[in-house]
């Protein structure tokens, strides 16, 4: 059994994203999000420990830009990243996005 390493609550989302690594610029979908990191559903894989730049499209228009380190990958499915060096403004936007997603999930469950 693996030890749970997550430090922040995650929410399920479906947000279009683009990411750029050392050798590639690719697209995918963020399907799991927290203030600490996310999982990107994509057939294009980054290397573990690779630093990537992530652009996540917001449901209200615009985008948020984040840097993260790949912490694990699942072949032909995607990879998880841990955010690094998030500015205060980006963290605030990330928290708003998570609150928005959490509210949508609660209204569906009700």
What are these model-predicted stretches?
Residues 56, 90-94, 107:
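Short alpha-helical linear motifs
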Residues 73-101:
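C-terminal structural segments of small proteins and small subunits
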Residues 64-66:
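PAS and PAS-like sensory/regulatory domains
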Residues 1-33, 95-110:
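N-terminal helix initiation/capping motif
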Residues 57-62:
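Short, charged beta-turn/beta-strand-edge "cap" motif at the junction between a beta-strand
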Residues 30, 68-70:
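Conserved hydrophobic positions within beta-strands
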Residues 13-55, 78-80:
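Short strand-loop-strand
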